[in-house]
Every structure is written in structure tokens, then in C-alpha cells.
Amino acid sequence: MENLTNDNYYENKEYMSASQFKDFLKCEAYALAKIKGEWIEETSNAFLVGGYVDAYFSKELENFKLKHTELFNKDGSLKATYKIAEEVIKRIEQDDYMMHLLRGQTQLVQTGTISGVPFKIKMDSVLDDTIVDQKIMKDTKDVWDNGYKAFWEMYGYDIQLAIYQYIHAQNEGVMKACKLAVATKESSPELAVYRFSQKTLNNALEIVKNQAPRYHEIKLGLIEPVGCGKCAYCRSKLKLDETMEKEI
């Protein structure tokens, strides 16, 4: 397999990533369409704000600016829509503990296997005893999805950090604590740090171990993906027939 670096990390399709795995959990058909380039999602303003902050702290801001010129005015300043990114950065830099968490080895790329499936990870900040993932979010409120869920569960951050911890341990021989360093995009940004219990990470890892082989076979074209029937991709592929009529 190709040796992964920061430069080619997002180009490689041979490895499963945490983001890719979470896509498969949502909808197998949608995830495969994204991998094949058959379904391209529009980049949201919220995603770009988070990307700007991430790039700033990982010292990749100049590359980010070159890729996303639409964020900037002719004089190089951020457009009004994205100004909140500067407020978030300012708030983070005022907090010594947040800055400590983000001063580890940044954007560390590693590879390994889970249940025989090749995985790749790219971590925001790795300290001697902790893996830190930075999240720039709308807020930290629980999210409704057929009942309220904690934001970290709703967005699969437990899955993500479980993958990071497991693959990093394969490379380094030590299981490190996993934390989320969160800043919100509110007018007065909130800062929060969440430490995952090992029980939470172990439970999430079991999901990965159980599902990864199936998702890998879908990527290889050995089995057909199952659509959720609810996401935007599935709705775009829906073909009506007489049996789907609704009586009113």
C-alpha cells in the first residue's frame, strides 16, 4: 500500500478512515457513492469555519487559504460570514489549558488494521499521554434523533477517538487517553474539554471491529451496499411505483 503523508492523506482510497466508517454507519449506499465520487456534498459555511480554525492551529493556514479563496475579500481579510473563526481562535488562545492540549504533535498520520481492515488516522494533537481531537461546533447541546443524544454520540466522536486510540497504540505500543477540545461558534465562544472513559471507547471499538469487515467488502465491490432510504442520496435515487402510493 502507498505510504501515507499529510500531502496524500485524503487522496488514498485503500484505507478506511474514521470519517469514512461513520459515513457507512449512516448509510452504506451513501458512503460508497461518496468514495466513488458519485455523490459530492456542498461544503457548508459551518464546515469552512471549522476548517479555518483547524488549519490555524495545525499551522496549515496558508494551504487552506489557497484551497478556499471564496472565504476572503480582495484585501485578504475574511468575509463577514466567516469572521466568527477569528473570534474562536482568539478565545482559544486566551485559555492556557486549551492551548496546552493543542500544542502536541499536530496532524500526525498513522496506519494500522482493525479486524484485518486497513485504517488510516490523522490526529489533531498528540501529547505524551493524550490524543486530542479539536472540534469547532455550533454548540454543545444534546441533539434530537428519535430522542435526545449527547452531541459526541450523535456525531460519532466516540467512534472516531476509539479508532485513533487503537491505531495509535499499534504504532506506539501505548494506549493514550482521548479528549475532545471543543470551541463553539456562538457570539461568545464556549470552550469545553471532554475526556472519554475507556469503557466508552471500548464499546465504540467493538462497533468498529464488528462492522469494518463488511464495509471493506462493500468498498471492494464484493457485496452490495444497503441504503437507509432516508438520506439525501437515497432520496435522489428513489424510483416510485404503484406499491408506494399513499392513501389519504
Q: Where do the protein language model's features map onto the residues?
A:
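Metal-dependent nuclease catalytic cores that hydrolyze phosphodiester bonds in DNA/RNA
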Residues: 1-122, 226-232, 244-245
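Short histidine-centered catalytic/ligand-binding loop motif
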Residues: 40-42, 74-77, 143-155, 197-199
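Hydrophobic (often cysteine-bearing) scaffold residues that line and stabilize catalytic clefts
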Residues: 45, 49, 160, 204
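Residue-level signal for well-ordered alpha-helical scaffold segments within enzymatic catalytic domains
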Residues: 51, 55-56, 130, 162-166, ...
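Metal-dependent nuclease catalytic regions and adjoining charged, substrate-binding loops involved
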Residues: 82-89, 153-155, 163-248
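Secondary-structure boundary elements
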Residues: 97-102, 127-133, 168-176
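Coil-to-beta-strand transition motifs
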Residues: 116-120, 127-129, 186-189
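Conserved catalytic cores of phosphodiester-cleaving nucleases, focusing on short active-site segments
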Residues: 121-147, 164
